[in-house]
């Protein structure tokens, strides 16, 4: 009997990707990352709405009780969505791991999806997310770059804007599709891995249904193009380069190089980054300012410089250090030069004064 139970626990564990790193501190974090972000959405914004349903009423606990209990234990819950994941996160005192594993399991397995919650709580919260996002023109430029570079898949809009009607039944169906054993990664910080696996197997997470693995493996199709959005406030000119896995190291170094004192371009650039996914990535950089004419001059300087063969090898050690601090090590030892070729372009703000892509 014991042998059968052990075998069942081992089989259950194999369904999940579970990893944890222990530490000497008193605080722990636990993240359940579900491959159910916007790239997998069958309706625009549905992943965002499902994320906002997390930590509402479940079959055995009200949302108020769930929040109150966690606060009494000194913990908190968060739910977020991006292009790849819906992430349920808990922060808590280390000794309370069993409670928070069970709580996350209840949310994944037993969320009630009550009809009144959609108009009264979920939709207002989603509108708030949009209002916060739209205060920063860089977020607008990033959405445009993704849409131009990928169109579908990673190009799908993350936030729900009400363009396409999404019903409660749609959200329930999407939850059934993505909240399955094959689509979940569980990551703990300040957590003993053996304990985490044991508690997961004993929780409702272990009772989640099986389903189709959604994690994208095939490389998405890349495009290049231009998008422009007239909007009040600061202006942004941005470029993006779709990146294959083999190019991750080069563009990690480039992003760190361009935002450090090693590059003469760094004063002109607001931000630069590489977003990495299992099968592709997107490098993007953003020039931002209140004066659109200055933004136009600066983006032209940046692109003109990057079209030359730029030696970025001086940033390898700095990049390696930063990535190690982010727990995202990549071998950058072979990185030398980079030269900008095809790219996507987005202009936001006073677009009458911002250049077109063919002027860069």
Curated annotation (Swiss-Prot):
Transit peptide feature range: 1-15
Self-association state and partner proteins as the record states: Component of the ubiquinol-cytochrome c oxidoreductase (cytochrome b-c1 complex, complex III, CIII), a multisubunit enzyme composed of 3 respiratory subunits cytochrome b, cytochrome c1 and Rieske protein, 2 core protein subunits, and additional low-molecular weight protein subunits. The complex exists as an obligatory dimer and forms supercomplexes (SCs) in the inner mitochondrial membrane with cytochrome c oxidase (complex IV, CIV).
Family: Belongs to the peptidase M16 family. UQCRC2/QCR2 subfamily.
Any one of the GO CC terms: mitochondrial inner membrane
Pfam families associated with the record: Peptidase_M16 (PF00675), Peptidase_M16_C (PF05193)
Subcellular location: Mitochondrion inner membrane
Lineage, top ranks: Eukaryota, Fungi, Dikarya, Ascomycota, Saccharomycotina
Single annotated GO MF: metal ion binding
Keywords: Electron transport, Membrane, Mitochondrion, Mitochondrion inner membrane, Respiratory chain, Transit peptide, Transport
Keyword presence, Nucleotide-binding: no
Topology in the lipid bilayer: Peripheral membrane protein
Stated name of the protein: Cytochrome b-c1 complex subunit 2, mitochondrial
Species: Kluyveromyces lactis (strain ATCC 8585 / CBS 2359 / DSM 70799 / NBRC 1267 / NRRL Y-1140 / WM37) (Yeast)
Superkingdom of origin organism: Eukaryota
Function: Component of the ubiquinol-cytochrome c oxidoreductase, a multisubunit transmembrane complex that is part of the mitochondrial electron transport chain which drives oxidative phosphorylation.
Protein's UniProt keywords contain Signal: no
Cited PANTHER family: CYTOCHROME B-C1 COMPLEX SUBUNIT 2, MITOCHONDRIAL, METALLOPROTEASE
